């Protein structure tokens, strides 16, 4: 996708206008916030656009140079710029791709053990720790909202909030079924078992994005209990919220305070309702979604972690890395996520060119 010189000039003019408005000191309140947001979104595009514009200008100037003493140097510089310009133009095309409006949002991370019993729960806990470590490397904050643990330290279900810069943009391709092949700690015969866990990454809305009326809620208060059914406290602090119009049910019992549990449950409910609306809207844009990496279906098997062979395979992009320990420790996950983002960008660019 080649960007015209006229379009480059438009980008530069718009960016200069935003810079001047923000520097004027006359913007206040909502106007300042809107201009700041537009500036932040346009800045990465404007920087690369200026780079491309300068390189194209140099090509014209060098090609027109008629000084024979400078011709050899000019030809060398022409060759260098011609070699570098396609990469800069590709970066510009990627920067100009339409953005998912949710990319900059924090995310709700939900991991549930699937087939495999206790081993699946242990794998779900491994996945959660992997994302915690990756988040720490990115400078993000992870707050656990609810955990349903088993007696072995595995997670039947864990829900957490992940906040920071570009959280949903990087984690959204993690949604789907993750499969593990290994010898479980509970296996005495040394046989390899296959288990699975489902990961869902949902963009978190602001409160104003999802209006929830009290009349649409049924709230139950009950006594919290821990793994194996033992009571973890003696007060009725656990909260179950049912959203009557949608049928969604959310429970939270991790906090000792009923009010904190209710606040966390409402946070989860708001996120799931927002996700339902996004799914419905995206269903109406089915053709656009075909350009995405994978189907986006959370029942799709997306990745296999094979412990005996020390490899991780992402089935959507046919990428296999023989670095399983490093991926589970967090650092290696970045390579997988970056590859998924690059593939998604390539597919969307191809769709626009087509």
Swiss-Prot record:
Any one GO MF annotation of this record: translation release factor activity, codon specific
Sorted UniProt keywords: Cytoplasm, Methylation, Protein biosynthesis
Location relative to the cell: Cytoplasm
Post-translational modification remark: Methylated by PrmC. Methylation increases the termination efficiency of RF1.
PTM sites of type N5-methylglutamine: 230
Keyword Protease: no
Main location, first listed in the record: cytoplasm
SUPFAM superfamilies: Release factor
GO cellular component: cytoplasm
Entry similarity comment: Belongs to the prokaryotic/mitochondrial release factor family.
Record function comment: Peptide chain release factor 1 directs the termination of translation in response to the peptide chain termination codons UAG and UAA.
Protein name according to UniProt: Peptide chain release factor 1
Organism: Novosphingobium aromaticivorans (strain ATCC 700278 / DSM 12444 / CCUG 56034 / CIP 105152 / NBRC 16084 / F199)
Higher taxonomy: Bacteria, Pseudomonadati, Pseudomonadota, Alphaproteobacteria, Sphingomonadales
